[in-house]
């Protein structure tokens, strides 16, 4: 007689495995399923089901068999000095970056506020550019802010 034992991981363990999967995808790690399964001591089919769930949730996309990439989203914000967009750094932060980090921990939001403020103040005070383009690129693991003048 064969018996099948089903093991359901705690939500924390599943989140840790998913996070590791995403980090390995970002690092372009070969043999993703095998690497993750060996690291966590789980069946590769469990890893495949987690990967498929990440694809369904559009957190990652399949490139080809065994190869995935993180799904990134981009937002562009044109700012104009003549329109008053560069009169203070809080306007640019509130309009361009804040909506994309509102669910982050408060300390992370504070760090972003400081860094973004330094970047935009440099443009406001030194470049005197009329037009500034801010691009926010975000995936499940990273957020990038680019300020071009």
How does the language model describe each region?
Residues 78-105:
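Helix-loop-beta hinge of the Bergerat
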Residues 55-65:
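A short, conserved structural fragment
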Residues 28, 34-39, 95-117:
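Conserved short strand/loop->alpha-helix "switch" segment adjacent to the catalytic nucleotide/phosphoryl-transfer site
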Residues 66-77, 121-149:
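Conserved beta-strand-loop-beta-strand hairpin that lines the nucleotide-binding pocket
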Residues 42-53, 110, 114:
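Short amphipathic alpha-helical interaction segments
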Residues 20-28:
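Short amphipathic alpha-helical elements of helix-turn-helix/winged-helix folds
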């Amino acid at each position: 007689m064969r018996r099948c034992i089903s093991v359901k991981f705690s939500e924390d363990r599943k989140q840790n495995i998913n996070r590791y999967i995403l980090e390995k995808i970002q690092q372009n790690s070969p043999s993703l399923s095998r690497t993750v399964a060996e690291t966590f001591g789980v069946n590769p089919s469990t890893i495949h089901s987690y990967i498929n769930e990440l694809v369904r949730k559009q957190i990652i996309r399949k490139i080809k068999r065994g190869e995935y990439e993180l799904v990134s989203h981009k937002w562009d914000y044109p700012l104009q000095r003549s329109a008053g967009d560069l009169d203070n750094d809080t306007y640019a932060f509130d309009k361009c970056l804040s909506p994309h980090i509102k669910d982050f921990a408060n300390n992370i939001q504070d760090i972003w506020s400081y860094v973004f403020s330094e970047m935009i103040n440099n443009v406001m005070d030194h470049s005197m550019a009329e037009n500034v383009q801010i691009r926010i690129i975000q995936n499940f693991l990273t957020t990038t802010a680019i300020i071009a003048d």
